[in-house]
Amino acid sequence: MSNYAPFIKPYVEYNEHGWGPCEVPELDVPYQPFCKSDRLGKICDWTAMVPEKKFPSKYASTFGNNSQYAYFYEDDDSTFHLVDTTGSKATKPYQRGRYRTNMRNNVRTRGRTGRGTPNIASLGGSTAGGATASTTKYGKGRHTRNTQNVGRRFGRNAPTRIRESSVMVQSNWVSIEEIDFPRLLKLALPNIKEGKDIATCGSLEFYDKLYDRVNLRNEKPLQKMARVVHTVTTTDDPVIRRLSRTMGNVFATDEILSTIMCCTRSNYSWDVVVEKLGTKVFLDKRYNDQFDLLTVNETSVEPPMEEEGSINSAHSLAMEATLINHNFSQQVLRIGDQEQRFMFEEPNPFEEPGVDLASIGYRYRQWDLGNDVVLIARCKHNAVIQGPNGDMQFLSIKALNEWDSKVTNSVEWRQKLDTQRGAVLASELRNNACKLARWTVEAVLAGSDQLKLGYVSRMNPRDHLRHVILGTQQFKPQEFATQINLNMDNSWGVLRCLIDLVMKQPDGKYLIMKDPNKPMIRLYDVPENAFDSDRDEEESSEPLSNSNDN
């Protein structure tokens, strides 16, 4: 006799004529209609339940309350009758705790007892949904309701916007590293000294101080300047090619460096091509890329939508902001053959015969980042001005543009720019935090003495071709970096982290990309011919300039 329990083989039904069980024993089971939100209030119906006075339908089912819409099949036409469409008041189901207010801290309730709460607005606070409360003479609260956020529930918010990547990731690309923004924000590389000039090229025109007097009562129209700006990448720069033979091991431009150093403030996707040749690393941008376009309202709560044919789409606004920035930086200069120019040691390396180039001075600077990492970058100035002591001060000139304050829910410049310029700048810092941080980093890298910001707005919100200059403002780059909470030690740390990561890899081509929908930086190993098609398209294109229709 075995000590174990006997194993009884179960009976398994086999259906030879179809799927499922062979027999269905439970047929004609009555169905009781119910609602999942009904509250269970009793277990057994031993005695009749005493209804409550306040909530008589506390345990009633909410299924089929509107019986006038129920369908009953009958052949007798005598039951046909007209339905009263005036509507019937449906019995509200009982729901525990729904929209129950805090009776203890209710201003209206406590006001009747003479012990009203203090004015919430005077303490700097506000009620939920943006409603403010105040106390009247007799203690009864008076509420100003803002129904924008009232009744918002979980899952009813606006859907998350899915952004597109700046470059399509191919299947043969190898993912090497993923670094999220919280890790990057903890990095720091302190005690980086000021960059040392190793070459200066080009010439600069002087800034016209008359534009410092521009205000809302004396606005100036923005002109279209027919000047060419060459946006040459790192490996195509002849000066960087010459310097790379004898000095440095990391080479880049100020636009590429500012993009990497301010990556933790970016929301849109971008990418930087990295080429490693022995001990040298070249940071490049892709050919025919949108890298040089300025973003608009990138860090806003509601950034611009991508709508084809709309002047307020993200791409159209980026093109508009780029042209505004180019035109403004050249219009505020003292232009003319008789005007004085500041000449650097070497001529413009991108000068072409018969082409009117924009006023840009290039400074090739060198930084020691430690651990035998020597960075050489091309930086630029837009203008020069004579200081109070007779010394020359270099300027970085940028322009902020307003397109439609009603759509963006921001401060209207034509009402607040002269009286509350700080509020206007704070609104721009909130909506364009990444762009302003990049401009500040570029000015710091170039060693500019001043960062000149211009406020340019559309003449009409529906016309994206005509603009006016409403005012200007200037800052010292280092002080402005402190005001916008830009930590240069952290920016240098982020750059050094990515450089060290590339230095550990074998020779080849890599891609640093900002994830379009996550706060994360990705590093890919890409083939050598990954972007050759973009290079062919770029060689057939022209440098950035103003056309007649822009």
UniProtKB/Swiss-Prot annotation:
Subcellular location: Cytoplasm
Entry keyword Cytoplasm: yes
Family in the record: Belongs to the eIF-3 subunit D family.
GO terms assigned for molecular function: mRNA cap binding; translation initiation factor activity
Region listing for RNA gate, in residue ranges: 290-304
Species name: Drosophila sechellia
UniProt key word Methyltransferase: no
Compositionally biased spans, kind Low complexity: 115-136
Record keywords, A-Z: Cytoplasm, Initiation factor, Protein biosynthesis, RNA-binding
Subunit relationships: Component of the eukaryotic translation initiation factor 3 (eIF-3) complex. The eIF-3 complex interacts with pix.
Name this polypeptide is given: Eukaryotic translation initiation factor 3 subunit D-2
Domain of life: Eukaryota
Name of a matching Pfam family: eIF-3_zeta
Function text: mRNA cap-binding component of the eukaryotic translation initiation factor 3 (eIF-3) complex, which is involved in protein synthesis of a specialized repertoire of mRNAs and, together with other initiation factors, stimulates binding of mRNA and methionyl-tRNAi to the 40S ribosome. The eIF-3 complex specifically targets and initiates translation of a subset of mRNAs involved in cell proliferation. In the eIF-3 complex, eif3d specifically recognizes and binds the 7-methylguanosine cap of a subset of mRNAs.
Disordered as annotated region, ranges: 108-152, 527-550
InterPro entries for this protein: eIF3d
Domain notes: The RNA gate region regulates mRNA cap recognition to prevent promiscuous mRNA-binding before assembly of eif3d into the full eukaryotic translation initiation factor 3 (eIF-3) complex.
GO biological process annotation, one example: regulation of translational initiation
Cellular component terms per the entry's GO annotation: eukaryotic 43S preinitiation complex; eukaryotic 48S preinitiation complex; eukaryotic translation initiation factor 3 complex
